[in-house]
Amino acid sequence: MTHQTHAYHMVNPSPWPLTGALSALLMTSGLVMWFHYNSTLLLTLGLTTNLLTMYQWWRDIIRESTFQGHHTPAVQKGLRYGMILFIISEVFFFSGFFWAFYHSSLAPTPELGGCWPPTGIHPLNPMEVPLLNTSVLLASGVSITWAHHSLMEGNRKHMLQALFITISLGIYFTLLQASEYYEAPFTISDGVYGSTFFVATGFHGLHVIIGSTFLIVCFLRQLKFHFTSNHHFGFEAAAWYWHFVDVVWLFLYVSIYWWGS
């Protein structure tokens, strides 16, 4: 490696953005094929390439940051700005779903029966599984904060315990959401109510799965002593993302489950 007199990381050419983009194309096309033609081939191919890309990209970043020392304070500052901008873009992403929901529900058209929920739709009881889901995510927000404080204090054992609890709660949330979808008395095809409900809660569920994966990687890295109290941006980014997922759920619960029912 040539000698450099600056603190910035000159990234090597990487195939993972391209394979990641291709996997996203395969997954979205595969979703359409699954919905319309009941074929899961493209979707499976997309998920497989996505998992391979994630594994190899994460491996490269861990190698560059932990073992080669490329993540200097200047690089970490750039990564922090990047993560903040990414979360802001996600806020706008979900804003679109809330806009669609409120646009449809605040002024229901005659086709919907002039009321919300539309005629013939039996909404889910917000005081049952959705309320349990809310408490599960709020508890996971507490445990991820506990993990962060434990890491800052150099308490590895408590950090691992708290991280394990957070991951378990994330998986539990996903299972509860899956059971709720399975038992829901309406489908994604049931007009604008079904569309807005399943797209908004489904995308949030996808974000919970992504966040849980991120936290699992952090857990495995902590088992290998990768994080220190002053060098742990990977974990910090995962924690920020998890808090974002938490806050989005509170808005979903209040808007779609409670007010919308």
UniProtKB/Swiss-Prot annotation:
Record field: catalytic activity: 4 Fe(II)-[cytochrome c] + O2 + 8 H(+)(in) = 4 Fe(III)-[cytochrome c] + 2 H2O + 4 H(+)(out)
UniProt GO BP: mitochondrial electron transport, cytochrome c to oxygen; respiratory chain complex IV assembly
Mitochondrial matrix topological domain: 1-15, 67-72, 153-155, 224-232
Disulfide cysteine pairs (residue numbers): none
Protein EC: 7.1.1.9
Topological region Mitochondrial intermembrane: 35-40, 106-128, 184-190, 257-261
Family: Belongs to the cytochrome c oxidase subunit 3 family.
Protein's UniProt name: Cytochrome c oxidase subunit 3
Annotated source species: Rhinoceros unicornis (Greater Indian rhinoceros)
Gene it is expressed from: MT-CO3
